Amino acid sequence: MPMSRAPRTARAELPKGAQARHVPVLLAEVLAALSLDRPGLAVDGTFGAGGYTRALLEAGPEVRVIAIDRDPTAIRGGADLVNAFGGRLRLVQGRFGELDTLIADQNEAQADWVVLDIGVSSMQIDEAQRGFSFRQDGPLDMRMGGEGPSAADLVNGEEETTLADILYHFGEERRSRAVARAIVEARRRAPIVTTAQLADLVAGVVRPEPGSPIHPATRSFQGLRIAVNDELGELVRGLHAAERVLKPGGRLAVVTFHSLEDRIVKQFFSARSGRAAQASRHVPGVERPAPKSFKLVTKGPVLPSEAETDVNPRSRSAKLRAGERTDAPAPPPLSAIETLASLPAPQGRGPRR
């Protein structure tokens, strides 16, 4: 299916003078896909700086929003937005993979719209102390919610083969084995505890592509970040949770920035709309027709306009897919996308340098 690039005029919807880091990607296209044309409840599963949430609230005076974020800093930062919209916004700290449970805790059984913006936020990247950036020195952390093992724990504690798999499958780093080997050799001398240490180490192994603006450490940092936060597993859980809470006619819009994220979303919508067979984890190996729980809103990925990528280069890899919930019951979770979100078994490793 051909990809659809948003028209150049879409950027006219952005607030005048807005900073790129505060403007959600594909905002006009997300709002069009959701079609907020009636009173109802919207769930923003990835609140961040509140860009999508504000737009949802401004779409209509009878739209209510529950906004979720696992990052307590983001939740604290949304207090002014809560006050500005007079009781129409509720902020909830938690993981969007549990959004059905989280909105039930808010005495809401179903939602009319769900939007998910997958991956790290610009705010997190820009704050050196969060440990996401290879361009600024800071502690090697990368935890979105502050809980669980940090990137430093993985880098200094995991076996070389596991590190290589993380870098290759989650970061798509072709020189994953060489990078993993260099990490293990370096940590024998001293622990790797800062982003600058790791970025310099990777840059010594991965040569920059001629003429490319991409830093040599980009893919390695991405792979570690995805592993630290279980981002792909969270995406799978979030898709299934959204499927459970959406009313018939409700819409789900998902923005991704990584090819594996997009593949998971594509397979989910393809299976749930009847375009592909569905395999359930409850009946492994059996593919059979299942109720069509979604119909496609976007026939292929919607890409940002050239104007948007000019203003916000971080948007260049973004893709939007959306679907509308049918009245069919939610089928069991899809085993195929759960597999995509996991590291392969050791014997599944392909040849890498």
UniProtKB/Swiss-Prot annotation:
Any one Gene Ontology cellular component term annotated for this protein: cytoplasm
Biological processes per GO annotation: rRNA base methylation
UniProt superkingdom: Bacteria
Catalysed reactions, semicolon-separated: cytidine(1402) in 16S rRNA + S-adenosyl-L-methionine = N(4)-methylcytidine(1402) in 16S rRNA + S-adenosyl-L-homocysteine + H(+)
Listed EC numbers: 2.1.1.199
GO MF term set: rRNA (cytosine-N4-)-methyltransferase activity
Residues reported to bind S-adenosyl-L-methionine: 50-52, 69, 96, 117, 124
Key words, A-Z: Cytoplasm, Methyltransferase, rRNA processing, S-adenosyl-L-methionine, Transferase
Keyword S-adenosyl-L-methionine: yes
Protein name: Ribosomal RNA small subunit methyltransferase H
Species in which this protein is naturally found: Methylorubrum extorquens (strain CM4 / NCIMB 13688) (Methylobacterium extorquens)
